[in-house]
Amino acid sequence: MKDQYDLVVVGAGPAGSIAATTAAKKGLSVLMLEKRQEIGEPVRCAEGVGKKRLRQHIELDEKWLCGEVSSAKIISPNGTTLTMAEEDAGSEVGYVLDRKIFDRTLVELSGEAGVDIMVKARVTGLIIEENTVCGVEMMHLGKTYSIRSKLVIGADGVESKVGRWAGIDTSLKPSHIETCAQFLVSGVDIDQSSCYFYMGNKVAPGGYVWVFPKGNNMANVGIGILGSRAGEKKPIEYLTDFVEANYPNGSIIEQVAGAVPASGPIEKTIANGLMLVGDAARQSDPFTGGGISNAMDAGLYAGEVAAEAIAQDDVSEKILQKYEKRWRGSFGNEIANNLIVKETFFSLSDEDLDSLALSIKDVDFKKMDLIDFIAALFKANKKLLWNLRPLFTQKLKQKFSGLTKFKR
């Protein structure tokens, strides 16, 4: 193992591997470090991802594709069902992945691009000189190593320490963390072309239950609950009750638990010599908790900017602003909007959720614009419309900001 690289990437999830591959293809020497002994383990997500954005990063392969969904069904507490086509249902609807194989495939592509990869490599600190990150301290097989680099990318997930070590505030309040549990359940008789989202305070207070088909009558059945809404009953207990009530003939064959940031993006994701990507940068969707597409996009931008900065021999925060601007300009508005949606919808009573669902269940979402949505909300619940006023204000600002830029 070398002791000096152009770039060190901490974490080998989708964000880290895409960043490493992108940088290596542009000629950088890259080391990617993963603290776990197996890539892709444990799986802590529903494994859904939108088609278009996935295909921008990797060619489809049946070995990690479990299925394809064409719609999302949202079920309110009283059973009212809203059906949305995949293009209207968010970045988690389209393909269902086998994340274990998918993540390993991304890392294999990194290796083919020339990236050095180490597993069971735990980063314990950063090397910081003259207020600039210039490497990492890490442990591997009981030994301590110092690896110097021109730049570090932190892709170390929701538990990220890399940003904090560099002085970036990545702290999360209980209301900004989704505590999650997921079962892989066999014997599930559902429409394999749809994924399902169950709302309501009885099934998931401050969150929702998801069901993603994986073929052969199997499905990922999971739950996410805001930490601020967690009471004595644990998420896994809510999930067990849901499975017993809805899939009495199902068998739980895998079980995982974890957490997802639901805070919206942190104030900044860069420092001198450092960029943060994916969950480490809190780039997941704060409403749905989904983050694969955003993570891959962020990894691409970070890898590109890493190559540009090193070519200029300048890894200052000023130069790395290119990364900050690219990802915020790409999907930052969507995250900001969905943070408002999360804070509104997760505070609603079951009666409000039912009222909203009944009001818009026959709406053609393809033809619905902001005015249609406001009208539907007004019909459903004036209080809800008032609570969502920050979202409407923000979306109007974004719309007219775009028009102003176009006119220029």
UniProtKB/Swiss-Prot annotation:
It comes from the Archaea. It catalyses: a 2,3-bis-O-phytanyl-sn-glycerol 1-phospholipid + 8 oxidized 2[4Fe-4S]-[ferredoxin] = a 2,3-bis-O-(geranylgeranyl)-sn-glycerol 1-phospholipid + 8 reduced 2[4Fe-4S]-[ferredoxin] + 16 H(+); 2,3-bis-O-(phytanyl)-sn-glycerol 1-phosphate + 8 oxidized 2[4Fe-4S]-[ferredoxin] = 2,3-bis-O-(geranylgeranyl)-sn-glycerol 1-phosphate + 8 reduced 2[4Fe-4S]-[ferredoxin] + 16 H(+); a 2,3-bis-O-phytanyl-sn-glycerol 1-phospholipid + 8 A = a 2,3-bis-O-(geranylgeranyl)-sn-glycerol 1-phospholipid + 8 AH2; CDP-2,3-bis-O-(geranylgeranyl)-sn-glycerol + 8 AH2 = CDP-2,3-bis-O-(phytanyl)-sn-glycerol + 8 A. InterPro entries: DGGGPL_reductase, FAD/NAD-bd_sf, Geranylgeranyl_Rdtase_fam, Geranylgeranyl_reductase, GGR_cat. GO terms for cellular component: membrane. It is an enzyme of class 1 (oxidoreductase). Belongs to the geranylgeranyl reductase family. DGGGPL reductase subfamily. This is Digeranylgeranylglycerophospholipid reductase 1. The lineage of its organism: Archaea, Methanobacteriati, Methanobacteriota, Stenosarchaea group, Methanomicrobia.
